[in-house]
Amino acid sequence: MPKLKNHSGSKKRFKFTASGLVKAQAAGKRHGMSKRPQKMKRNARGTFVMFKADGEKIAENFLRVK
């Protein structure tokens, strides 16, 4: 049976912390930013650590990490 390949898009979008949690970019910053409050834009800057359950799903289904 051939090797299962990792999801290419997921490899680019998610990173792991040293403790095994998953980091991702904040969503909702592609367009229409002039209508958004400054606080919302500021909070969407940088990366955030996903909830543990969501991170486990990403790792299992897309990145093939157990």
Curated annotation (Swiss-Prot):
UniProt protein name: Large ribosomal subunit protein bL35
UniProt cross-references to InterPro entries, sorted A to Z: Ribosomal_bL35 (IPR001706), Ribosomal_bL35-like (IPR021137), Ribosomal_bL35_CS (IPR018265), Ribosomal_bL35_sf (IPR037229)
Family affiliation: Belongs to the bacterial ribosomal protein bL35 family.
HAMAP family in the cross-refs: Ribosomal_bL35
Entry keywords, A to Z: Ribonucleoprotein, Ribosomal protein
Molecular function (Gene Ontology), one example: structural constituent of ribosome
Any one GO cellular component localisation term in the record: ribosome
Region described as Disordered: spans on this chain: 25-45
Gene3D superfamilies the UniProt entry points to: 4.10.410.60
Keyword Ribonucleoprotein: yes
Organism superkingdom: Bacteria
Biased composition, class Basic residues, residue ranges: 28-44
